[in-house]
């Protein structure tokens, strides 16, 4: 989806974008680059790129290069709804970690990324049954579930259904690094 000069029409920004804080094929050929900006959580993160989840059942997979994240950054694959869910890579002072979060239960699962700075993230959704499951891969072929299966119920707060989201933000209220 990100090999051209413009986004395909299916993609939309979740907020008004800051055009200085993202690039498509300019800073790194063949990649979308998101510069992290301050936000406390995914729903407040600017420059979050979204599209409606394809149903009734689908997978969304992304390759994430987290090598240029800075401490406090989180970048990943979200499921925007009310409640939302996410699987991201978080940079702490001890290194990179996967963080799977379910706002519905307020549970999070952390897993250290030992040496890998590149990870594939996947969201499985059965949108008729309101079920989501995240998984990850270190090679793009072998996938391991992370966290429990989540509920993403139909609700009337946002009228949008689940929107798959690519995001990067910094919880330390700083402009951070970049996610490709």
For every predicted segment, state its role.
Residues 1-180:
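Extracellular glycan-recognition regions
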């Amino acid at each position: 989806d990100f090999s051209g000069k413009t986004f395909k029409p299916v993609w939309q920004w979740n907020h008004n974008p800051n055009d200085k804080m993202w690039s498509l094929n300019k800073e790194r050929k063949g990649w979308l680059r998101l510069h992290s900006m301050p936000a406390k959580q995914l729903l407040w993160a600017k420059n979050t790129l979204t599209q409606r989840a394809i149903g009734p059942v689908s997978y969304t997979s992304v390759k994430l290069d987290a090598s240029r994240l800075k401490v406090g950054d989180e970048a990943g694959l979200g499921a925007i709804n009310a409640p939302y869910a996410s699987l991201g890579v978080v940079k702490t002072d001890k290194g990179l970690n996967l963080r799977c979060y379910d706002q519905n239960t307020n549970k999070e699962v952390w897993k250290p990324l030992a040496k890998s700075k590149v990870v594939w993230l996947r969201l499985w959704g059965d949108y008729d049954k309101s079920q989501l499951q995240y998984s990850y891969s270190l090679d793009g072929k072998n996938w391991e579930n992370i966290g429990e299966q989540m509920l993403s119920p139909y609700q009337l707060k946002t009228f949008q259904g689940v929107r798959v989201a690519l995001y990067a933000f910094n919880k330390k209220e700083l402009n951070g690094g970049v996610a490709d």
